[in-house]
Amino acid sequence: NNASGLAGIAYWINDYYCLPEDFKIDKKDSLVVKMKEIIDEEYAQGRNSILGDDELDNMIRAIDRDRHREYVAFGRVRKAGR
């Protein structure tokens, strides 16, 4: 949501993709910074609902397709209801 900061975005990525310790990212990562910019712009343009997992996943794919592919390759993407 619009109250999530950089650390919250990094946490979501690490958790959603179940990244192993060696691949975890932090709030200073360029992907996290770019996502925050996009999210902030969405809310600045009037969005008032939270972004869902699918939207965030697609955002990562749009920003960095190679990294997205790497994350998904772990094969442990958190599924709904899990």
Regions found by a protein language model. Name each.
Residues 1-82:
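Terminal or standalone catalytic/regulatory effector modules within metabolic enzymes
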